[in-house]
A protein has these predicted regions:
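Short beta-strand/loop segment that forms part of the nucleotide-sugar
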Residues: 7, 28-37, 57-62, 86-87
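Short, well-formed alpha-helical segments that are part of the catalytic scaffolds
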Residues: 11-27
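A conserved acidic beta->alpha catalytic loop
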Residues: 22, 35-45
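Glycine-rich, basic loop-to-helix element that forms the pyrophosphate-binding segment
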Residues: 61-77
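Donor-binding/catalytic cores of nucleotide-activated saccharide
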Residues: 66, 87-217, 223, 232-234, ...
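Short aromatic/hydrophobic "clamp" motif used to bind/position activated sugar donors
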Residues: 82
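Catalytic core of nucleotide-sugar-dependent glycosyltransferases
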Residues: 197-203, 210-239, 248, 252-280
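Membrane-interface aromatic/basic loop that binds lipid-linked glycans or pyrophosphate carriers
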Residues: 260-352
Length: 352
């Protein structure tokens, strides 16, 4: 069996060698590195690695983003299965072959899904919210919507039958969701593994800061992706679970990152959130996710004017969610703000 490893590379000169060194399979394999217009020494490092490893294919392109880079890799892969690896991440020792064994011994398995851990090189912590899929079992999306908890490209081995799928190139936030959900829907069986197979090297603060800085465009991307995924999903259970995954675990924390940084309620913020809430009403959604978004906005922000609160209150009333009048809001809700912010900050770090 031949394994294709697809690695998008952008300004990863300091980490790409470690990432490639983690590809320790005994299977026949190819590594496809897509240099996405790097402005550091990534290309030089990759050219040197290509001399050292004849099974590395290097593709250079203008900067187009991770989605376009992965799509380029998919177009060039020749393996029976494929996997994705980010240039600053790594496979854990012997885990590629561990996954390959499960793939090869079951004809009905089209995807092998291992666990991802976050942290710094060698100091891995399992992702808290992935507990429901930490088991040795073959599942389908319809019976186990929880697999949408693992919605990124890492830690998975895909059958080559999915090589014609593509990542969304018109968004930069959550661009992997449609690809992953479509593959889950098409797969005959998905083999879950309780073992950590992939290490995500997290740079403290970088993700939070980026999300806060790109808040407006990320909210637009999230809404676009959410609409597409909801159209893909077949049942209310699937759509409600995806709402939890997207609306609560992604969008509400995107909001929280922005509010933690800016700490003031603005019309721009309210317009983004109310647009998103109105869109949620058009699909099945998680009530818990909805109320977390509301809590983040109300108890995380300050300097609410009467006019802004009235806009907010009318939006929620229009979707059947009652809110107190402005004066009761100031007396009953805002005093909870300081206590709530401490709790939300703790939960934020646990959920990441």
């Amino acid at each position: 069996m031949k394994i294709s490893i697809i690695i998008p590379v952008y300004n990863a000169a300091s980490t790409i060698r470690r990432a490639i060194a983690s590809v320790d399979t005994k299977q026949n394999y190819e590594i496809i590195c897509i240099n996405d217009g790097s402005t550091d020494e990534s290309r030089t490092v990759l050219e040197q690695l290509q001399k050292e490893h004849p099974n590395i294919t290097l593709i250079n392109q203008e900067n187009k983003g991770a989605a376009a880079s992965r799509n380029k890799g998919l177009a060039h892969m020749t393996g029976d299965v494929f996997m994705f690896l980010d240039a600053d991440d790594e496979f854990l020792t012997s885990r590629i072959d561990f996954m390959a064994d499960f793939y090869q011994k079951a004809e009905d398995v089209d995807i092998v899904l291992g666990q991802i851990a976050k942290g710094k090189h060698g100091e891995w912590q399992p992702i808290y919210t992935h507990q429901e899929i930490q088991k040795l079992e073959k599942v389908e999306l319809a019976q186990c919507p929880d697999i949408m908890q693992s919605i990124g490209p890492g830690g998975k081995m895909f059958s080559a039958q999915f090589a014609d799928l593509r990542f969304d190139e018109d968004v930069v936030f959550c661009e992997e969701h449609c690809f992953i959900i479509t593959a889950y829907k098409k797969a005959k069986k998905i083999q879950l593994l309780p073992n950590i197979v992939y290490g995500y090297n997290e740079i403290e603060g970088s993700v939070t800061n980026q999300r806060a800085e790109q808040f407006e465009s990320y909210m637009l991307d999230a809404l676009k992706v959410r609409t597409r995924v909801m159209d893909l999903l077949s049942s209310k259970d699937e759509r409600t679970y995806y709402s939890y995954r997207m609306d609560e675990l992604i969008v509400s924390y995107l909001l929280q990152a922005y509010i933690e940084k800016n700490n003031v309620i603005t019309k721009k913020l309210l317009d983004s959130v109310t647009t998103y809430i109105n869109a949620m009403q058009k699909t099945d959604y998680s009530g818990k996710a909805m109320f977390r978004i509301i809590k983040v906005v109300e108890q995380g922000s300050k300097k609410w004017s009467k006019a802004l609160y009235q806009q907010w209150r009318e939006t929620l009333l229009s979707v059947g969610i009652g809110r107190p009048n402005y004066y009761r809001f100031k007396v009953e809700v805002l005093p909870k703000r300081a206590k709530s912010r401490g709790k939300m900050k703790l939960k934020y770090y646990l959920k990441r």
